[in-house]
């Protein structure tokens, strides 16, 4: 199933972070925080401004992004967990 978010919303799949501390201790799932880094899976067409023009979304499918710890709404699609959030909730795009 494919998904197309509306307006300036973005669908993100969380990227798993390293589960081992610098000292080599494995961190269990119950103690680990949810990652704040993810991959953009789908983007909407953009935000409609007050004058009727549409401002396109600045992130693209495949971008790796940084977002707030409590940003977005968690959804499950075909057994996969995703986040749906507004573009404004994305703080940065990883480059390089």
From Swiss-Prot:
GO terms for biological process: chaperone cofactor-dependent protein refolding. One of its GO terms (cellular component) is cytoplasm. It is found in: Cytoplasm. PROSITE patterns: CHAPERONINS_CPN10 (PS00681). Disulfide bonds: none annotated. SUPFAM superfamilies: GroES-like (SSF50129). One of its GO terms (molecular function) is ATP binding. It comes from the Bacteria. Together with the chaperonin GroEL, plays an essential role in assisting protein folding. The GroEL-GroES system forms a nano-cage that allows encapsulation of the non-native substrate proteins and provides a physical environment optimized to promote and accelerate protein folding. GroES binds to the apical surface of the GroEL ring, thereby capping the opening of the GroEL channel. Heptamer of 7 subunits arranged in a ring. Interacts with the chaperonin GroEL. Belongs to the GroES chaperonin family. This is Co-chaperonin GroES. It comes from Halorhodospira halophila (strain DSM 244 / SL1) (Ectothiorhodospira halophila (strain DSM 244 / SL1)).
